């Protein structure tokens, strides 16, 4: 959270900006800068709806030092879905993944699923504390499938896609657990660029034909990463 205010000096003096920043741990600092901070500049490029969402979220934040408590309350009780999802993603950045995982088990959030799965995947850095927290959040929702779903969220080569990992993603499309269907489908979609007219929020028994098309792609070794994914992967050391 932060507020930036411009303080104009007397004529002939250089304009200065006083920046007040409240950090997640509750500490506050006031600095004088020559220009507005990067986070403020970014906030000016938000759409009208994004600005409204941000204002709604800030309105429910208290002056307490525990911002996580405020964000949890916003996620659990706010009337606007967009505010709830932003609160969940803020908590994710603070290392709390339970709220964002809950959204993947709720069809009301279907419009946010792709961005959320992508955001979680970006947190999958081996050796980081996030890995343990993601695994713990998945464990209570996916049970025995936790390990394979965690693998789905990581990087994936063509060989893995055409091997056991790809098979697990396709199998996940038929899961009774919505979260597993959501992650399996969105990872397949993002990697291959295909959908096969599959919808993770629908009962898998109603999507037999779509699932069979995915199964056939895997059997024929035609599950391949689209060019955009390969180009991005080549930039990662």
Residue ranges and their predicted role:
Residues 1-10:
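Glycine- and acidic-residue-biased ligand/ion/polar-headgroup-sensing regions
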Residues 9-25:
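Tight coil/turn sites that cap or link beta-strands
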Residues 21-48, 75, 95:
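Regulatory inter-domain linker segments that are low-complexity and enriched
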Residues 43-55, 80-82, 99-237:
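Long, helix-rich interaction regions
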Residues 60-65, 127:
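Helix-turn-helix repeat elements of alpha-solenoid scaffolds
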Residues 67-86:
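Alpha-solenoid helical-repeat scaffolds
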